[in-house]
Structure formats: C-alpha cells, structure tokens
C-alpha cells in the first residue's frame, strides 16, 4: 500500500478492482482547504485514459507485476502460443494485445511479457530485430539518381523502406520502435 504522497508516474495501482498505470501525478496544495492528488491514469486492460482526484492521505494498493521471458511457439486463430523459458509452461496470448508487434517476431524467437496474476498485460520487444527480405524490386546498375529507397517485404510480412542496394534474401536489421531500416547484415 502506498499513500498519496508516494504515488509517482509509472506505478501500476489497483483502483476499484481495475489495474491503472499512473501516467501523470499532480500533488496540489491549496492555500485554503486540504491537499489533493490529481492522477492521469491509463487502464492497463482497455488503454482508456481517465483523470481522477483523491484526497491527501488516501492509500492505494500497488499491483505486483512480473516480467517473464517467453518463446513464440505457433499461431492458431486469434492467439499465439508462447512458452515460459524458465518453467516451460505454455499459454495463449491474444493477437489483439500484440497488435503490430507480431510483425517483429517470428516463431521460436524470445521476448518479454508483463504479467499480473498469470494474465499477460503487455509485451516488450527488443530495440531491433533481424529479418530476411523476401520481396523487393530488383536493383539496376546506376539506379542511384533518385537517392531514395524502395519498399521491401520481410519474412514476417512487415514492409520496410530500404536502400536500393538491398536484394531479396539479404538479412537486415529493423528498429522495432518505428519500423525503419537500420542496416544490412
């Protein structure tokens, strides 16, 4: 349990049975009246943002979140099945939770998931990943007048703008935060 004075940005609290991540915490002390805490909260499950006000001295329960390293096994319908790399337990993760992250992970790769009481809340991708180019326009000798890139489709289905010298079958490194080409490997 934490009091209003200990609440900071980044904490995950349980309020009215729901999990909320503190996006912003403003401690307000007025000249007259009691101090209060105004929180901008994001519901961890629904991503809805709300602003709530609490009186000074109120206490909150902190959610005990854990990070687990998992391996992507396979996809079936609207779920991917992953395996905890420490306990070898297998469990499904909703594709809706992963959104665009599926474009950066392949079968048998590992990544971290954030869990609360065995419920997967979020995933954490590495800063960059290696991918193989499976489709792109051919490179023509002397075709550098435009100076721009060309679209390339990777083995996961992600379309990335790459320099004109990148060919089909080559390995590239892609930034997972913005989906941009970093380098050829």
Swiss-Prot record:
Gene3D superfamilies: 2.30.30.30, Nucleic acid-binding proteins
Origin species: Herpetosiphon aurantiacus (strain ATCC 23779 / DSM 785 / 114-95)
Function, in words: Involved in peptide bond synthesis. Stimulates efficient translation and peptide-bond synthesis on native or reconstituted 70S ribosomes in vitro. Probably functions indirectly by altering the affinity of the ribosome for aminoacyl-tRNA, thus increasing their reactivity as acceptors for peptidyl transferase.
SUPFAM superfamilies assigned: Nucleic acid-binding proteins, Translation proteins SH3-like domain
Gene: efp
Biological processes, Gene Ontology terms: peptide biosynthetic process
Recorded superkingdom: Bacteria
GO molecular function, one term: translation elongation factor activity
UniProt-recorded name of the protein: Elongation factor P
Pathway where it operates: Protein biosynthesis; polypeptide chain elongation
Main location: cytoplasm
Pfam families: EFP (PF01132), EFP_N (PF08207), Elong-fact-P_C (PF09285)
UniProt cross-references to InterPro entries, sorted A to Z: Elong-fact-P_C (IPR015365), NA-bd_OB-fold (IPR012340), Rib_uL2_dom2 (IPR014722), Transl_elong_fac_P/YeiP (IPR020599), Transl_elong_KOW-like (IPR013185), Transl_elong_P/YeiP_cen (IPR001059), Transl_elong_P/YeiP_CS (IPR013852), Transl_elongation_fac_P (IPR011768)
Family named by the database record: Belongs to the elongation factor P family.
Keywords annotated in UniProt: Cytoplasm, Elongation factor, Protein biosynthesis
rRNA-binding keyword on record: no
Localization per Swiss-Prot or TrEMBL: Cytoplasm
Gene Ontology CC, one term: cytoplasm
């Amino acid at each position: 349990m934490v009091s209003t004075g200990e609440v900071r940005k980044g904490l995950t609290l349980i309020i009215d049975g729901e999990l909320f991540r503190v996006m912003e915490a403003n401690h307000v002390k007025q000249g007259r009246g009691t101090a209060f805490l105004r929180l901008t909260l994001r519901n961890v499950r629904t991503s809805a943002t709300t602003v709530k006000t609490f009186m000074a001295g109120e206490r909150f329960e902190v959610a005990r979140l854990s990070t687990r390293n998992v391996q992507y096994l396979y996809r079936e319908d609207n779920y991917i099945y992953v395996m905890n790399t420490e306990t070898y337990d297998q469990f499904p993760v909703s594709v809706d939770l992963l959104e665009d992250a599926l474009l950066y992970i392949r079968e048998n790769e590992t990544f971290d998931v954030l869990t609360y009481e065995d419920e997967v809340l979020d995933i954490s991708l590495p800063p960059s990943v290696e991918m193989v180019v499976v489709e792109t326009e051919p490179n023509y000798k002397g075709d550098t007048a435009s100076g721009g890139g060309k679209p390339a489709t990777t083995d996961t289905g992600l379309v990335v703008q790459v320099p004109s010298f990148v060919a089909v079958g080559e390995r590239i490194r892609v930034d997972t935060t913005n989906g941009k080409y970093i380098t050829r490997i």
